[in-house]
């Protein structure tokens, strides 16, 4: 096999993006227009080095010069730059994705992994449960979630928000194992009454690989391990609008596929 520069196909694009200086130039140009001398100065590069790399970007159609002689991203270049953050996120978290899957997510979700780029990674079951509790407690309009497991300790936290008028919508896996005492607790807090009032709505899917919980302010996502089960030891937590939209789109996608909630399918702990 030859290691020479590819002349056509997507390989030629990846080759142009392979240089750190060229990537930095594209990132800078996505923010504003530059003259080459300004760009070289901000990136601490020599004029010779900057000129050589910029010539490549211009020849590849990613960058052009405007009437004032300033460097600008072409429409094609701007589109390419918008896609780079998805690769950046996957690269920065490559150790995680070496032993975690994406749970069979449709391509339209995988192609938007850039939505995760500003997320915080939360480690440990206790830390994750605490974040869930805070998310529930701070909800003012709604809570939506897709769950494979039922945390008994948080049911009362959710119910207190529902009592305050927060709408709660959730999707359970039909093979979820529910903790002992859940049925009695739901009866105690009047869960059926919440459902009849339309404050709580629920549906069911055969299984859940990717979990999410989100409200109008925050969101979190848990991906599955190599067994296909959500890893409750690592969670992506974020506040960005794009990330919350990703969570909402995943929820809506699963909600449309989900069937009627059937309590009898749930496995109860002995």
PLM features per residue range, with description:
Residues 2-31, 38, 43, 49, ...:
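PLD/PLD-like phosphodiesterase catalytic module centered on the HKD motif
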Residues 29, 77, 147-148:
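Short loop or secondary-structure boundary microenvironments that flank
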Residues 44, 68, 127, 149, ...:
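Short beta->alpha linker loops
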Residues 66-87:
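Basic, amphipathic "hinge/linker" alpha-helix immediately C-terminal to the N-terminal HTH DNA-binding motif
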